[in-house]
Amino acid sequence: MQIRDAIITVTNRTDLSQDDAAAVMEQMMNGEATPAQIAALLTALHFKGETDAEIAGMAQVMRAKSLAVPHDGGVVDTCGTGGDHSNTFNISTTAAFVAAGAGATVAKHGNRAMSSKCGSADVLEGLGVNIELDAEGVARCLRQAGIGFMFAPKFHPAMRYAGPVRREIGIRTIFNVLGPLTNPARAEYQVIGVANAGLAEKLANALSKMGIRRALVVHGSDGLDEISISASTLVFDVRAGATPQASTISPSDFGLSLAPREAIAGGSVEENVAMTKAILEGSDTGPRRDIVLLNAAAALVACERADSFGEALRQAQQAIDTGSANQRMQRMIEASNG
């Protein structure tokens, strides 16, 4: 399908097939579509509403065109789609260190702040991590530290055609949800946080269509794009080719107390760096630690290092209490600057 035909199809509120969405994405990524055509299609998809098949088709192409990171397999990514405007501290980034401390290999894919003051790239840079690594540099971090970071702008050169357009039109587009699905390390396991319940189900179905080995797509009922400490969380358990299974979990299921959203609020880069350090060093034992434990546990379940959330939570607690999580952070800083 040509992009002009796709624009007409979507404007008529007809969905694209996964193959047609992929074909159109190829044209956008290869520079075969004009800026006007890209803007028209993105806007039409926005108002029609993107389907899981459209998301899967476009994500497969975008991921295939990213700069691949070599590794030995079995890596997990933890990230959110953003857009919850919650201004929390960097939960998934801190949880990534804890998951690594518990033995997972974490290939984190992220960017600078979108809906908060401090994104994953910002806090990692503040901690002393070199975020400007190429694929081999990230691979070195994975080998030496068990955790690496792929700064999205460096790994998606094909976005040079669509990137300026999506910024200029100024609305949320399908690209806002493609990021977590396009990990350059081709992560076999994922935890993806989503601020909208309907979108969570779409992403779960898209991941299944893309053949993910296992993923958890989570949505806090308070609107958080993480597993929440302030409310229950909707969890879609995704396995390749299978219908995602939905369930609900609550902090109380694991003996953790509910806490108000203000208790996990973030601040400036410097403040968020201090919060991450306090959790990993073991000096913060309050709600911030608890929400990190829950989200690290999700990563351990997703990458099948634990059979249950309860077991995963114990592994996450041990990773902090033994100093292993903090050690992973220090190793990542060293490896990224090596």
UniProtKB/Swiss-Prot annotation:
Sites where the protein binds Mg(2+) 2: 225-226
Residues bound to anthranilate 2: 166
Residues holding anthranilate 1: 80, 111
Catalytic reaction list: N-(5-phospho-beta-D-ribosyl)anthranilate + diphosphate = 5-phospho-alpha-D-ribose 1-diphosphate + anthranilate
Chain's role: Catalyzes the transfer of the phosphoribosyl group of 5-phosphorylribose-1-pyrophosphate (PRPP) to anthranilate to yield N-(5'-phosphoribosyl)-anthranilate (PRA).
Keywords: Amino-acid biosynthesis, Aromatic amino acid biosynthesis, Glycosyltransferase, Magnesium, Metal-binding, Transferase, Tryptophan biosynthesis
Enzyme class per UniProt: transferase
Cofactor: Mg(2+)
HAMAP family on file: TrpD
Pathway assignment: Amino-acid biosynthesis; L-tryptophan biosynthesis; L-tryptophan from chorismate: step 2/5
Gene Ontology process terms (BP): L-tryptophan biosynthetic process
Binding sites annotated in the UniProt record for 5-phospho-alpha-D-ribose 1-diphosphate: 80, 83-84, 88, 90-93, 108-116, 120
EC number from the UniProt entry: 2.4.2.18
Chain sites annotated for binding Mg(2+) 1: 92, 226
Entry protein name: Anthranilate phosphoribosyltransferase
Gene coding for it: trpD
